[in-house]
């Protein structure tokens, strides 16, 4: 069993590491944290330009068809510099739900996410429910109106669209 990284994975790791060590010093990160969005819009655009937002999505949706190992390499480097951009909330969580959805417009939404044009937020957590989606109190009416409470909606302040479990 070969547990070595591929050449592409080593390039990805080096690319993320270089960003984290050259463009993400403490003062820059604190400026981002204290901004209205809680992250750097310039860094988010750079993530899109570098193809990082496309990694977990299939090629037919504008993605790079990356693997969980690719994501883990990125998160290892992100963790070293405490990267605050909403990659987990936007790309992995909300993007993962979009990718697996049966929405007619999912490709359009994912292409907007991959390009950095749109951000999404997953609203699935409810008070006293933990991560259990089998017992959701929130209701979504036929008119699309949401009735109920969601908590810990990651990336809510930046979201162009919300994915709500009801």
Please identify what each model-predicted range represents.
Residues 98-102, 141, 164-166:
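Short beta-strand-to-turn element immediately C-terminal to the catalytic PLP-Schiff-base lysine
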Residues 116-127:
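A short, Trp-centered hydrophobic/proline-enriched beta-strand micro-motif
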Residues 147-166:
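A short core secondary-structure module
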Residues 132-147:
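Cytochrome P450 C-terminal beta-domain/meander region
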Residues 83-104:
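N-terminal glycine-rich flavin-associated loop
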Residues 66-67, 132-134, 155-159:
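Short glycine/proline-enriched turns and hinge-like loops at secondary-structure junctions
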Residues 1-88, 108, 112:
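Amphipathic, small/basic residue-rich leader segments at the start of a protein or domain
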Residues 72-75, 95-98, 163:
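Conserved protein kinase catalytic domain
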